[in-house]
Amino acid sequence: MAIDVSFEMENKIGEVKEELASRIPNILEAIGIEAEGNAVSEITEMEAVDTGRLRASISHAVDGDAVYIGTNVEYGPYVELGTSKMEARPFLHNAVANYVDDYKAIMEADLKR
């Protein structure tokens, strides 16, 4: 008794790549929003708030496959990096470095949908 077995394979790699590429901007936007909140928390915890202007100025921008977080306040770099007379209070660095697992979780949650 002969058994005929046949199957057909279809390559969907291109579609999968397109789907993943289409999700990247939304993932980066979600990470940017989270990073903004984390930077605000870092500034507040460091007691680096006088008028609240720096804290209110924190924003993010998605550009291609990257997200940037920063401030347009002229004294932001001095707070972040310090000066010869003022100790650094790296709120932006900490907002990225201290929350890597949170950002990974955002990516994973989106990709599991």
Predicted regions mapped to residue ranges:
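Short, Lys/Arg-rich flexible segments
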Residues: M1-R113
